[in-house]
Amino acid sequence: MKSIIIALLLIAHLSAQSQNDQGTIVYNRQINYVKMMTDLPYLSEEEKDRTKLSWGSGTWDTNYNLTFDPNGAIYTYGKTEREYNYSWRQDEFLIIDDLKKAEQMKQFVIGGRLYLLEDEKPRTKWKIKNEIREIEGYLCMKAVTEDTIKGQTIVAWFSDQIPVAAGPEGYTGLPGMILMLDINDGAAIIEATTVDLAVVQHPIPKKIKGKKLELTEYDALIEKFMAESIEGERNPFWEIRY
């Protein structure tokens, strides 16, 4: 009898694990503009002081939804934007990851112009660390990577309890779901606030607009914008995503 109970418990555990590969995660994306701009060496002290005066210790918070299954993930604006009557922005920021083909589609705006990146997704060079923490009841491990174009250090916390190699902001490639990102030591924090593991229907728009770019063109666009902003002593992240 005892062996039967153990077997049933094991089956239930395996069944629960198998059901963890699709659902919807709500993330809160919090930007600390004062920290972000303080860390930019090419900005004038006057510009940094104006930011401190405008923002103080405040942050800018936005909710995003990630719907996922073993084949892919979609990341876009969540309820916060609709509550503040900005639902039109949902059609202007969208990331679709095809996890099977290792391809990505990203819709975004730079300088008031709508772009659409469609290409193979480059493999992120993650370094997994020997640190753990709990997020929304899931045990997570730490991984670190660098964005050399934007000058960012990205810390990710991922959990293999959700066995899908996806995450917010288009970051993928870890052995489990990314539940938190920390960009440049707190300048931006993207953290899961709700995890709903249920069968999902991906909310893909019928037509996704934007000037089409390949990955090399996208990288060149970001590099050019960063270089022009640095030369002009401007904050590039008023226009491009931090």
Can you say where each PLM-predicted feature lies in the sequence?
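Bacterial Sec-dependent N-terminal signal peptides
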Residues: 1-25, 240-242
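Extended soluble regions of mature proteins
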Residues: 20-242
